[in-house]
Amino acid sequence: MLSNNAVVVYFSRIGENYSVGEIEVGNTAKVAQVIASRIGAPTVEIVPVELYPNVYDEAVAQATQERSAGARPAFTLVAGDGADNPAAMLDSTETIYLGYPIWWSDMPMPVYTFLESRDWSGKTIAPFCTHEGSGLADTVASIRRVVVGATVLDGMELRGAVAQNDVDATVRAVDGWLG
């Protein structure tokens, strides 16, 4: 797996979670942190301008409405190391490790907003996701449709409950994917 000149970009949600209760660090964020530590890359979080509610059913209602409307929620990029310009970091990198949870067999809409907002020509994207039974669903194909000019690698999937509760299993899964 490519790791030189890489950035780990991810979307993750905190609060009440479907399978693991109340969480302070999102499932996908936990996997992103493991990947970043294994390859020595910085992280950048996709943060929606309108945050999802902490209450699970309220977050589901908001996400369902966004998906039904084909919404493209506004977002900001937040660098894990506090860098001032994470967008410039993405412009200068060759490989993007892209993480997201699976919501109804798809990526959350802010991830689509992010993907559609950039020129991906010449970049390599390595997708990874957390889920509770859907695997990657059809998200790798969706990414390939959106990121014209990029190479999209096979993705890695991990159950959110594993990411949240079993660091050793998460590290093994990441190491197996990175090769």
Where do the language-model regions lie?
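Glycine-rich phosphate/pyrophosphate-binding loop and the adjoining helix
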Residues: 151-179
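Thiol-based oxidoreductase modules, predominantly thioredoxin-like and allied folds used
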Residues: 128
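A short helix->loop->beta-strand "cap" motif at the edges of active sites that frequently abuts
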Residues: 121-124, 149-150
